[in-house]
UniProtKB/Swiss-Prot annotation:
HAMAP family: PlsX (MF_00019). It is an enzyme of class 2 (transferase). The keyword Ion transport does not apply. InterPro entries: FA_synthesis, Phospholipid_synth_PlsX-like. Its EC number is 2.3.1.274. It holds the Pfam family FA_synthesis. Homodimer. Probably interacts with PlsY. Disulfide bonds: none annotated. It is found in: Cytoplasm. GO terms for cellular component: cytoplasm. GO terms for biological process: fatty acid biosynthetic process; phospholipid biosynthetic process. It comes from Pasteurella multocida (strain Pm70). This is Phosphate acyltransferase. Pathway: Lipid metabolism; phospholipid metabolism.
Length: 339
């Protein structure tokens, strides 16, 4: 395992340092070769670091900045007023070479915009996309993109997403000739928007890609495809629906029902009578799959959910470290040139 420095926007997310700082400590404890640059308000950060071991503290650098990018502002306003914010400074640290990757739970549109401006897309890529690993019910994994970076996409955009997703799956999931599917409202060739049908035609013509056809939302976790492609609007809605359903079912299993009389009954039934199903459901814990990567850029940028808890944000940090050590942007560029 090689030494690595990541830049964190610790002010991003719904709660900020009270989540991101404990997450940083979890990540450092699990990865002894990792160092972190913490961008944010030092008055909020330093009290959370008072009682940590010296060996851990020496791998942390607090970079004070008092400004943040608010989720309430639109993309144009956020970009115009981004100078000196925790998000921009974290990305600039990667641009300058002070860090090799960046993690933020802040405004998705601003993160996408600033990353494109400061880090630049890979040669030939029209639009970077948000990609995430998702679990399957059989214990496997798939990748899904775009998850919200690009709301409107044409056929060429979707084709490029499929290409990047295939290379990403090859290098992160160790898959050979990953199966690609387009997320659609039906499996028939005539279903869906024109852009999706046209993208299907492009994919069918490319023998280098293992395109298998359309996939419907009810089969996303069934392991029928290794790479699931959609525009950012559809992908974001689908992913959040999956995550919400998984969290609600897991809460039910753990006996968190509002009906106190049913709590013990549900918990006992699901952990004893349906034990095998319970073990499968535990694999679909959204916290363990927190973090979507902005692929198609020259460096690793990972977007955490704004509502992530400390364990989930720590997973996003670990994901950024893994991708950086695996040199995923370089491998995507090499793959693009090959195709």
């Amino acid at each position: 395992m090689s030494r690595l420095t990541l830049a964190l926007d610790v002010m991003g997310g719904d709660i900020g340092p009270r989540i991101t700082i404990p997450a940083s400590l979890i990540a450092l404890e699990k990865d002894p070769m990792l160092s972190l640059l913490l961008f944010g308000d030092s008055q909020q950060i330093l009290p959370l670091l008072e009682n940590i071991p010296a060996s851990m503290k020496e791998r942390l650098t607090v970079c004070h900045c008092s400004r943040t990018i608010d989720n309430e502002h639109g993309i144009s306003y956020a970009l115009r007023h981004s100078k000196g914010t925790s998000m921009r400074l974290a990305i600039e640290a990667v641009q300058k070479g002070d860090a090799q990757g960046c993690v933020s739970a802040g405004n998705t549109a601003a993160l996408m915009g600033l990353s494109k401006i400061l880090l630049q897309p890979l040669k030939g890529i029209q639009r970077p996309a948000l990609i995430s690993v998702i679990p399957t019910v059989d214990g496997g994994k798939s990748v899904m993109l775009d998850l919200g970076a690009n709301i409107d996409c044409d056929a060429e955009n979707l084709y490029q997403f499929a290409l990047m997703g295939s290379i990403f799956a090859e290098n992160t999931l160790n898959l050979v000739y990953p199966r690609i599917a387009l997320l659609n409202i039906g499996s028939e060739d005539i279903k869906g928007h024109k852009s999706i049908r046209d993208a299907a035609m492009l994919l069918e013509k490319d023998p280098a890609l293992n395109y298998t056809g359309f996939i419907e939302g009810n089969f996303l976790l069934n392991g029928q495809a290794d790479v699931i492609v959609s525009d950012g609007f559809v992908g974001n809605v689908a992913l959040k629906t999956l995550e919400g359903a998984a969290k609600n079912v897991i809460a039910l299993i753990k006996g968190k029902s509002k009906n106190s009389l049913l709590k013990p009954l549900f918990s006992w039934l699901l952990t004893h009578i349906f034990k095998e199903s319970y073990q499968r459901l535990k694999r679909i814990n959204p916290d363990e799959y927190n973090g979507a990567s902005l692929i198609g850029l020259t460096a690793v940028v990972v977007k955490s959910h704004g509502s992530a808890n400390s364990d989930a944000f720590a997973y996003a940090i670990a994901d950024a470290a893994f991708q950086t050590r695996q040199q995923i942007p370089t491998k995507i560029l090499a793959g693009l040139e090959k195709y």
